[in-house]
């Protein structure tokens, strides 16, 4: 990366942005495949690898072939094997696409590193560990007391391939690199398989994943930039101050000041308080836009976005892909949670001189609940219980050792508690723990050809409690002097940044 930074110094990159010559450098492919000195992952996607087929000999042959006049003959040849190179052409195309994806990421990486270094005092932040899922945590923890409606948006697809090239022109000003990108899109890959998924989330083939995700993230960035533009255009009423004073429980006061606003050639005096105009979050192929506006205003936003995307991306985007829902009476499945907004009532007694009176306040709070029915369905599909939630034994694990059986059940339980640690109500998880605990006991009893009660009396109940309560043990070690408030800490919502790494139940056989 240091050699790349020397090649793309700020003054040179601003004047030329010549990225095309880098595709003929061997170290680019070493960095792209994590076989060089730099073992860092891409900021956009973790490198999937090439099944140990990468070697510098293949890279040298590839670069030699590209220097020839008809070096792209390996792509246009109908046969799977190239007679001149004697190697699978898909491997060469995959190597070139991975190297090209790494090259076009360089301007983004350098710009991100420079911005983060200036912001954090020359301390580079490891942003390759962050995903779009992490932006949902502050969204779910934000204050929704002033929001009324929400737009559930499915990101538009498909997009014309030339639009992708035009989008990258604002970032990569090297014409040769753009021509090479256009060649990749139109000559090698199927034109209808890039971003044409009929599901809310997008999935790509294992080959060329890095390149596909780079194009998709660039496209999503272009879509999301429209929200910034629309927000700036709609915020023509300037506001200067806002204050939240916590006097008692759920008591909030707003400081309002006189603001002078110039609009349509005449001066208007308005009383305003500054409040967030919209809340936006995206995860996979869905995005949510929450606002404090009325239904009529949200409907205007809906048609504005539809018309804007149709004109900007030259695609047919139906209004049915954007749904307007009221926060107070609508629940949605989001990130595996059943999310809804509920009113949290609070009663405060106030006394003035000899008279006392009660004040009833209702605060909007965003709830993230555990979907118990889908979870039981997943456990039933994996043969841990019946469809009604009655625990059963898992015969396919009876041949394993006792420690392996306990470890598998414990890992599933810990993963579920770890993922749903951000739930507002964790009582549902204890029903899942009961199912897994009893299923584990029945599996062990089946293995030893005894009943559950006999097995527990012989081995002791501590054997199951030891691996199923690791979450409480971690909290007790973290807060050793606060055992009395341990239950309150455990009930609070905790968001872990590594929840995207947790495997699904389908991965356990």
Curated annotation (Swiss-Prot):
GO terms for biological process: mRNA processing; RNA splicing; tRNA processing. One of its GO terms (molecular function) is RNA binding. It is found in: Plastid, Chloroplast. It holds the Pfam family MatK_N. Coiled coil: none annotated. Its main location: plastid. GO terms for cellular component: chloroplast. Keywords: Chloroplast, mRNA processing, Plastid, RNA-binding, tRNA processing. PANTHER family: MATURASE K. Belongs to the intron maturase 2 family. MatK subfamily. Usually encoded in the trnK tRNA gene intron. Probably assists in splicing its own and other chloroplast group II introns. HAMAP family: MatK. This is Maturase K.
């Amino acid at each position: 990366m240091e050699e790349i930074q020397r090649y793309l110094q700020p003054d040179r990159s601003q004047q030329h942005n010549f990225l095309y010559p880098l595709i003929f450098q061997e170290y680019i492919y070493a960095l792209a495949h994590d076989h060089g000195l730099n073992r860092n992952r891409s900021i956009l996607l973790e490198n999937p690898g090439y099944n140990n087929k990468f070697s510098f000999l293949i890279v040298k042959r590839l670069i030699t072939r590209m220097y020839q006049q008809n070096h792209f003959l390996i792509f246009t040849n109908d046969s799977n094997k190239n007679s001149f190179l004697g190697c699978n052409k898909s491997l060469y195309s995959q190597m070139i696409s991975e190297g090209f994806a790494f090259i076009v990421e360089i301007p983004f990486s350098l710009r991100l590193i420079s911005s983060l270094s200036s912001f954090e005092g020359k301390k580079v932040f490891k942003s390759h560990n962050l995903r779009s899922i992490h932006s949902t945590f502050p969204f779910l923890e934000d204050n929704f007391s002033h929001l009324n409606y929400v737009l559930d948006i499915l990101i538009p697809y498909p997009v014309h391939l030339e639009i992708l090239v035009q989008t990258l022109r604002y970032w990569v000003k090297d014409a040769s690199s753009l021509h090479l990108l256009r060649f990749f899109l139109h000559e090698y890959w199927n034109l209808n398989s890039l971003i044409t998924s009929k599901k809310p989330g997008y999935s790509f083939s294992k080959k060329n994943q890095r390149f596909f995700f780079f194009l998709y993230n660039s496209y999503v960035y272009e879509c999301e930039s429209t929200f910034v533009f629309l927000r700036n255009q709609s915020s023509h009423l300037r506001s200067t101050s806002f204050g939240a004073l916590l006097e008692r429980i759920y008591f909030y006061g707003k400081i309002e000041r006189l603001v002078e606003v110039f609009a349509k050639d005449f001066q208007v005096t308005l009383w305003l308080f500054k409040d967030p105009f919209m809340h936006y979050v995206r995860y996979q192929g869905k995005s949510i836009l929450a606002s404090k506006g009325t239904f009529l205003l949200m409907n205007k936003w809906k048609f504005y976005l539809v018309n804007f995307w149709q004109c900007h991306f030259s695609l047919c985007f139906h209004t049915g892909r954007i749904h307007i829902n009221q926060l107070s009476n609508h629940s949605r499945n989001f990130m595996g949670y059943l999310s809804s907004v509920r009113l949290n009532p609070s009663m405060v007694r106030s006394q003035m001189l000899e008279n006392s009176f009660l004040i009833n306040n209702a605060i909007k709070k965003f709830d993230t609940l555990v979907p118990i029915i889908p979870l039981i369905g997943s456990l039933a599909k994996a043969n841990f219980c019946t469809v009604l939630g009655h625990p059963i034994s898992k015969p396919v694990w009876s041949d394993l050792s006792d420690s392996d059986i306990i470890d598998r059940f414990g890992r599933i339980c810990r993963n579920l508690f770890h993922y749903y640690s951000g739930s507002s109500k964790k009582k549902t998880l204890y029903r899942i723990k009961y199912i897994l605990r009893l299923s584990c006991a029945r599996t062990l009893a089946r293995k030893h050809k005894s009943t559950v009660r006999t097995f527990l009396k012989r081995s002791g109940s501590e054997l199951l409690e030891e691996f199923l309560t690791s979450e409480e043990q971690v909290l007790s070690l973290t807060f050793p002097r606060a055992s009395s408030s341990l239950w309150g800490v455990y009930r609070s919502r905790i968001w872990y940044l590594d929840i995207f790494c947790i495997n699904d139940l389908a991965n356990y056989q």
